[in-house]
UniProtKB/Swiss-Prot annotation:
Modified residues (Phosphotyrosine): 927
Species this protein is from: Porcine adenovirus A serotype 3 (PAdV-3)
S-S bridge residues: none
Name listed for the protein in its UniProt record: Hexon protein
SUPFAM superfamilies reported in the protein's UniProt record: Group II dsDNA viruses VP
Residue spans crossing the bilayer: none
Record lineage: Viruses, Varidnaviria, Bamfordvirae, Preplasmiviricota, Tectiliviricetes
Protein origin, superkingdom: Viruses
């Protein structure tokens, strides 16, 4: 087999296309064209699901897919390892491209799993309304007479004067004895507002004893303890009797004794809050007193948990040792050699995007790409359409709390004086009833559209603010582990950072949110879909089909007449294989996975004997090696950027740059990037999207400038661009020359480079890319320009004051001053923020511009003739770089971030794997990655 040094230079870039016909050898392409009725080689994906229509020799050859059971398996703490024996019979060709693992097991997504927003329990209750309950006096004393009650006796009916129990009437109008273990039921009451005319004088209900902990009605749950729905936990229900008439014992004696007109059945229940928590709480000494009645609940934050897109992270690819094996019968040497930086996970994401629309979801391979709502990432604060006031009225509309007596008019004899007397029937206590209201109908106004918009901003933006803009509510116990769900869930955002008046009228992403991972959000529809595939319960069984994405083997055909050993390891680290909305540490929060079985499904091409023999002979020929190229075809490197650092120099030692195509790069957060060399990274306490693996890049906007300098005197890429050679300016804050573009701070130069690199559009005239090029990860689709005006504080220091958010007030008296979702406080008063930017009172402003470009890898193509790169191959490269060794120095200037990050650089090199099978049971593989590394393996 040819060694790397023997491969001719001229052939490097002529097999760089992604279509199979471009990188298979000519002989094999000719063969595939002659046998199109058997299988299709387009785009690396074969379709072996339809049997051929002729030349099929045996029944066995029509079995297109076989299940292989592992001959050996090893279940350890961190991995599950399986080994298979692949027997490829005569007249059969095994297609490793379409193999997949069929995995069954059980999954505990942990107590942090919450697949919905809001609460499932008493969602209609006000957030701080108490349940019917008893409470202690403010001093917390419990002696007789010191236990107070607050309750609604909704079950209206007469009270038995002898027993004190409420009388319940059955359908036959017969009164029955109640069962206090569940009667009266709390959901029953008058069916209509008119049932309360006249006002009910007696009734009953249930009430929680003072020994049951305080909890707002919103989110309250107590499990039933009997089939009737009763909830008392010890079968001890104590009736309590109350009266409100007469008031004193002396009056009672005149009325023949005191009589109850309200009976409450008190009980202790197992009160819980499964999906809510307190955001306003009193200290423990006041919890059982009246102060505990006003505690406020909020729903736990939604946290979808499912397998990652395309099961990223489940198959363990070690970059330092061989965790996978493909060995032939004749030798046990491993054909899966050390491919330290093949990027195959990110490559696979971009590869699939080039094949079909990733906005379509497929359950079979868990293909539901991570996404975010653009209306959340880039806020268009258009205000609210609230020209019409919104009123709410009493259910009966007319007030019924004022009772009137009907009069009649009569004239008095000769004096004709008018007198008034009661109408007949209205005299005494048995007269007619008249409930009359005076004036307009009583109503209350609520600004529905403003509340909906404010609620959207709070739930979708404010709750996702960085932790430094949040506080821990007093008296609420919080886990000190900042990566835990309890901590993330209970922290509250500071007021006025995100509200209806912030950036009103602008299309602008809040600056504090730009560096927050937008894919870690409950509006990540791909993650939500993958979570829902597993069901809506914490504990679930899973049965998944996981494709093998290892690019060295992706399109490999195993030839007939041999047995191969094939083994792989599967991770069991829940932070790596599962993805959560909030990115909390699933290990610490109790998630667990148990793999019960792994089978391998492999597809064969059934062929007639002559056809199979011909294919085998051709593939065994030295000139017909199977040649496979990684989609990104790059060597990746990670460079740490410490917190608050803005300059990062990189040096690459001297080497030959033949076949080099350029650079792709972006920025990653350190805590979102695992160490891939270990099956279990103890420092990876995060479970959100992993940009390093799944392509959810979002920090591209933090680059300012890149300089690239070879150690030669030749200026690269020439002085035919706007700026100086060897330097690329991404954005500029001050633009005196007008070098920025598209109402942003991106330079025209950088815009030109990206259009060249992504679409091969080499001029700045009006031109749009072809549709097939503008896919999910492309430049223009993700380019988000933004612009806004802010008061000119610098030049008007005496007039315009930068009031801190804690001293800003807007809608005072109608909203909370403590945090956005709190109870309203204060009184109506003119707002002091923001400064008006419109109308006759508009202040002097300055214009701010910026952009976001998520998902996209910035690219700088490498060519000596930069403006005439053609199809971006190496054909135009200067011979100085192509045939001589040079050292490379790069300097990246970036925005400072207050946490450690990583510079992710892809050196677009020639990355190829050649596979040869000269004899049955023997596989030879050569791996070439110039200019960075080469290797080979023979089995």
């Amino acid at each position: 087999m040819a060694t790397p040094s023997m491969m001719p230079q001229w052939s490097y870039m002529h097999i760089s296309g992604q279509d199979a016909s471009e990188y298979l050898s000519p002989g094999l392409v000719q063969f595939s064209q002659a046998t199109e009725t058997y299988f299709n080689l387009n785009n690396k994906f074969r379709n072996p699901t339809v049997a051929p229509t002729h030349d099929v020799t045996t029944e066995r050859s029509q079995r297109l897919q076989l299940r292989f059971v592992p001959v050996d398996k090893e279940d350890t703490q961190y991995t599950y390892k399986t080994r298979f024996q692949l027997a490829v019979g005569d007249n059969r060709v095994l297609d490793m491209a379409s193999t997949f693992f069929d995995i069954r097991g059980t999954l505990d997504r942990g107590p942090s799993f919450k697949p919905y927003s809001g609460t499932a329990y008493n969602i209609m209750a006000p957030k701080s309304a108490p349940n019917n309950c008893q409470y202690l006096d403010p001093k917390g004393e419990t002696e007789a007479g010191k236990v107070n009650t607050i309750a609604q006796a909704s079950f209206v009916g007469p009270i038995d004067e002898t027993t004190g129990d409420i009388k319940i009437t059955e359908e036959e109008d017969e009164e029955t004895t109640i069962d206090p273990l569940y009667e009266p039921q709390p959901q029953l009451g008058p069916s209509s507002w008119s049932d309360n005319i006249p006002s009910a004088t007696s009734g009953a209900g249930r009430v929680l004893k003072q020994t049951t902990p305080r909890q707002p009605c919103y989110g309250s749950y107590a499990s039933p303890t009997n089939i009737h729905g009763g909830q008392t936990k010890d079968d001890k229900v104590t009736p309590l009797y109350f009266t409100n008439n007469p008031a004193t014992e002396a009056e009672a004696l005149e009325e023949n004794g005191l009589k109850p007109n309200v009976t409450l059945y008190s009980e202790d229940v197992d009160l819980k809050a499964p999906d809510t928590h307190l955001v306003y709480a009193v200290n423990q000494t006041q919890e059982f007193a009246q102060y505990g009645l006003g505690q406020q609940a909020a729903p736990n934050r939604a946290n979808y948990i499912g397998f990652r897109d395309n099961f990223i992270g489940l198959l363990y690819y070690n970059s330092n040792g061989n965790q996978g094996m493909l060995a032939g019968q004749a030798s046990q040497l491993n054909a899966v050699v050390d491919l330290q930086d093949r990027n195959h996970r990110t490559s696979y994401q971009l590869f699939l995007d080039s094949l079909y629309d990733r906005s379509r979801y497929f359950s079979l391979w868990n293909q539901a790409i991570d996404s975010y709502d653009k209306d959340v990432r880039v806020l268009e604060n258009n205000g609210v359409e609230d020209e019409m006031p919104n009123f709410c009225f009493p259910i009966g509309a007319i007030e019924t709390n004022m009772t009137f007596t009907q009069l009649k008019k009569s004239e008095n004899g000769g004096s004709r004086a008018t007198t008034w007397t009661k109408e007949n029937g209205d005299d005494g206590g048995n007269g007619a009833e008249h409930y009359l209201g005076i004036g307009n109908l009583n109503a209350m106004e609520i600004n529905l559209t403003a509340n909906l918009w404010r609620s959207f901003l709070y739930s979708n933006v404010a709750l996702y603010l960085p932790d430094k803009y949040k506080f821990s509510p007093p008296n609420v116990p919080i886990d000190p582990n900042t990566h835990s769900y309890d901590y993330i869930n209970k922290r509250l955002p500071l007021n006025n950072l995100i509200d209806t008046f912030v950036n009103i009228g602008a299309r602008w992403s809040p600056d504090v949110m730009d560096n927050v991972n937008p894919f870690n959000h409950h509006r990540n529809y791909g993650l939500r879909y993958r979570s829902q595939l597993l069901g809506n319960g914490r504990y679930c069984k899973f049965h998944i089909q996981v494709p093998q994405k290892f690019f060295a083997l992706k399109s490999l055909l195993l030839l007939p007449g041999a047995t191969y050993t094939y083994e792989w390891s599967f991770r069991k680290d829940v932070n790596m294989i599962l993805q959560s909305t909030l990115g909390n540490d699933l290990r610490a929060d109790g998630a667990k996975i148990n793999i019960e079985s792994v089978n391998l499904y492999a597809s064969f091409f059934p062929m007639a004997h002559n056809t199979a023999s011909t294919l085998e002979a051709m593939l065994r020929n030295d000139t017909n090696n199977q040649t496979f190229i990684d989609f990104l075809s790059s060597a990746n490197m990670l460079y740490p950027i410490p917190a608050n650092v803005t300059n990062l120099p990189i040096s690459i030692p001297s080497r030959n740059w033949a076949a080099f195509r350029g650079w792709s790069f972006t920025r990653l957060k350190h805590n979102e990037t695992p160490a891939l060399g270990s099956p279990f990274d103890p420092y990876f306490t995060y479970s959100g999207s992993i940009p390093y693996l799944d392509g959810t890049f979002y920090l591209g906007h933090t680059f300012r400038r890149i300089s690239i300098q070879f150690d030669s005197s030749v200026a690269w890429p020439g002085n035919d661009r706007l700026l100086t050679p060897n330097e690329f300016e991404v954005k500029r804050t001050v633009d005196g020359e007008g070098y920025t573009v598209a109402q942003t701070n991106m330079t025209k130069d950088w815009f030109l480079v990206q259009m060249l690199a992504h679409y091969n559009i080499g001029y700045q005239g009006y031109h749009l890319p072809e549709g097939y090029r503008d896919r999910t990860y492309s430049f223009l689709r993700n380019f988000e320009p933004m612009c806004r005006q802010v008061p000119d504080y610098a030049n008007h220091k005496d007039e315009y004051l930068e009031v801190p958010t804690t001293n800003q007030f807007n809608s005072s008296g109608f909203v909370s001053a403590a945090f956005t979702a709190g109870m309203r406080e204060g009184h109506p008063y003119p707002a002091n923020w923001p400064y008006p930017l419109i109308g006759e009172d508009a202040v002097q402003t300055v214009t701010q511009r910026k952009f976001l470009c998520d998902r996209t890898l910035w690219r700088i193509p490498f060519s000596s003739n930069f403006m005439s790169m053609g199809t971006l191959t190496d054909l135009g490269q200067n011979l100085l770089y192509a045939n001589s060794a040079h050292a490379l120095d790069m300097t990246f200037e970036v925005d400072a971030m207050d946490e450690p990050t990583l510079l992710y650089v892809l050196f677009e090199v020639f990355d190829v794997c050649g596979v040869h099978q000269p004899h049955r049971g023997v596989i030879e593989a050569v791996y070439l990655r110039t200019p960075f590394s080469a290797g080979n393996a023979t089995t």
